[in-house]
């Protein structure tokens, strides 16, 4: 595992900046079901179909 090497880009030193980066990442993600309920429904159906026939 890489050692921690501080610096200006270190989120541990600036929690507010880390929070903002997390929000931006979530907004940019294209797989957000909140904005597409139909897609979420289809994903749920697919998951249910695959979870029952494994044995």
Curated annotation (Swiss-Prot):
It holds the Pfam family KGG. Disruption phenotype: Knockout of the gene increases production of pyocyanine and promotes P.aeruginosa pathogenicity in vivo. Deletion of the gene has no effect on phagocytosis, but it significantly reduces the production of cytokines in murine macrophage-like RAW264.7 cells and human macrophage-like cell line THP-1. In an acute pneumonia murine infection model, infection with the mutant inhibits cytokine secretion in the lungs but increases the infiltration of inflammatory cells compared to the wild-type strain. Induction: Highly expressed in biofilms. Residues 11-23, 36-45 have a biased composition (Basic and acidic residues). Coiled coil: none annotated. InterPro entries: Stress-induced_KGG_rpt. Residues 1-55 are annotated as: Disordered. May be involved in the regulation of the production of pyocyanine, one of the major virulence factors secreted by P.aeruginosa, and other virulence factors. Belongs to the con-10 family. This is Putative virulence-regulating protein PA2146. It comes from Pseudomonas aeruginosa (strain ATCC 15692 / DSM 22644 / CIP 104116 / JCM 14847 / LMG 12228 / 1C / PRS 101 / PAO1).
């Amino acid at each position: 595992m890489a050692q921690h090497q501080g610096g200006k880009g270190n989120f541990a030193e600036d929690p507010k900046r880390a929070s903002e980066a997390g929000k931006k990442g979530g907004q940019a993600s294209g797989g957000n079901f909140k904005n597409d309920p139909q897609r979420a429904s289809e994903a749920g159906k697919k998951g249910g179909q695959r979870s029952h026939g494994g044995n």
